[in-house]
Amino acid sequence: MVKTQTYTERASAHPSPVAQRLFKLMDNKKTNLCASVDVKSTEEFLTLIEKLGPYICLVKTHIDIIDDFSYEGTVVPLLALAKKHNFMIFEDRKFADIGNTVKSQYSGGVYKIAQWSDITNAHGITGSGIVKGLKEAAQESSKEPRGLLMLAELSSKGSLAYGEYTEKTIEIAKSDKEFVIGFIAQRDMGGTDEGFDWIVMTPGVGLDDKGDGLGQQYRTVDQVVTTGTDIIIVGRGLFGQGRDPTVEGKRYRDAGWNAYLKKTGSL
């Protein structure tokens, strides 16, 4: 059943401090927009986030595609922008290995993701050990709480993440009510009857385009929110060729928020 509670109501009862913070932020800023900023230079990355920051609750990064990445030059300014504009950070790492390996991938290497990213995500392909490994890395790397999303469904054409795979991934998510805060999915993932309040974040959302020729399939803001999405993830729709990030950021922010108000009966 699609949740119709407000973000504030959900924050008050959520077991995860990360989810609580995110829900409160969304309500305060009146936005459920996550900007997916996939660009190859630190300068463009930070410039886009500066423009989009006022309109988003989250920025989604693929930090490993930035050619000139450095912790001091890329992450430190990103954290400053997050503080300035009051948004959280989601590194779209899609971990998919055994627990011991992902623990090292999350905490170490060049990127040290657990030190700076509020939220990350993982596939369920290797079982529940991946949740345990990532949680241990989070606890050992940062005093700040961290949250994990499981990849239950994908927006790409021909995706294998459906049916039994999705159901098994949901079962893995149930292994840690505090650390696993929700899913990357196309619809509500249930769990309410068992006391879970999962956040659903949905990529492949567009107000104009239907696809990109490389397998991405777009759905409208109203379509995804009506079927259970809490946060809309938008990338090229915000800053693709010929688009003004400030104009599009406001446009998608307003569309997402109005869809949320309709769903909760507030509009």
From Swiss-Prot:
Pathway: Pyrimidine metabolism; UMP biosynthesis via de novo pathway; UMP from orotate: step 2/2
Sequence positions that bind substrate: 38, 60-62, 92-101, 218, 236
Catalytic activity: orotidine 5'-phosphate + H(+) = UMP + CO2
Keyword Lyase among record annotations: yes
A GO CC annotation given for this chain: cytosol
EC number: 4.1.1.23
Gene3D superfamilies linked: Aldolase class I
Active site (UniProt): K94 (proton donor)
MF GO annotations: orotidine-5'-phosphate decarboxylase activity
Keywords per UniProt: Decarboxylase, Lyase, Pyrimidine biosynthesis
GO biological process entries: 'de novo' pyrimidine nucleobase biosynthetic process; 'de novo' UMP biosynthetic process
Classification via InterPro entries: Aldolase_TIM, OMPdecase, OMPdecase_AS, OMPdeCOase_dom, RibuloseP-bd_barrel
Annotated family: Belongs to the OMP decarboxylase family.
Protein name: Orotidine 5'-phosphate decarboxylase
Organism: Debaryomyces hansenii (strain ATCC 36239 / CBS 767 / BCRC 21394 / JCM 1990 / NBRC 0083 / IGC 2968) (Yeast)
Classification lineage: Eukaryota, Fungi, Dikarya, Ascomycota, Saccharomycotina
